[in-house]
Amino acid sequence: MTSAVGNTGMAAPQRVAALNRPNMVSVGTIVFLSQELMFFAGLFAMYFVSRANGLANGSWAEQTDYLNVPYALAITVILVSSSVTCQFGVFAAERGDVYGLRKWFLITIILGSIFVIGQAYEYFTLVGHGLSIQSSVYGSAFYITTGFHAAHVIAGVIAFVVVLMRIQKAKFTPAQATAAMVVSYYWHFVDVVWIGLFITIYFIQ
């Protein structure tokens, strides 16, 4: 009887410890996104410093005239829509609905790819107007900030492809559902960053 009580007493702290132990996937995701947040904060700071210098010498305003705001708004809507489809995919993963996960993540991949292609076309148009990364301070700030963001979008699209490939090759598991959720966190983060960039570059200018 004493032994049983003793074992119960030992088991309770172990259960409490297990419950209090942080989820390493969640911790890793938070750390990674925090690093990304600091990276983009640096890009925003660089943009505003460049803007202040450009406004001081009068070269900034004339460069912003090349921006096609309605076009940028259209591809922004596409990217934001991809965040919605991504979340629908996560909901499907939580239900164990593999077909739904594949469908919504595939749509997300398509929308993300359209955004990247749309941004590449914008670059092509701006270069045609003489605005390149080497043409001015504004050009450098514009291409560096939007270019790094585009690279993150491409990385997100690749991550979605990897998740879909893993689902195709093996039985759907909780680990795969977790992977889908982690990728969605990254994608939502990238979308929020773009909204900030869009407001800064195309409206504040």
From Swiss-Prot:
Regions that span the bilayer = 29-49, 73-93, 104-124, 144-164, 184-204
State the GO CC annotations: plasma membrane
What does UniProt list as this organism's lineage? Answer: Bacteria, Bacillati, Actinomycetota, Actinomycetes, Mycobacteriales
What single Pfam family name could you report for this chain, choosing any that match? COX3
**Signal peptide span per the entry?**
none
Designated name of the protein? Cytochrome c oxidase subunit 3
Tell me yes or no: is Membrane among this UniProt entry's keywords: yes
- What keywords is this UniProt entry annotated with? Cell membrane, Membrane, Translocase, Transmembrane, Transmembrane helix
Recorded family membership = Belongs to the cytochrome c oxidase subunit 3 family.
According to the record's subunit comment, the protein's assembly and interactions are: Associates with subunits I, II and IV to form cytochrome c oxidase.
The record's subcellular locations are: Cell membrane
| Membrane topology term | Multi-pass membrane protein
Q: Which CDD domains match?
A: Heme_Cu_Oxidase_III_like
GO MF annotations, alphabetized? cytochrome-c oxidase activity
The EC number(s) given in the record are 7.1.1.9
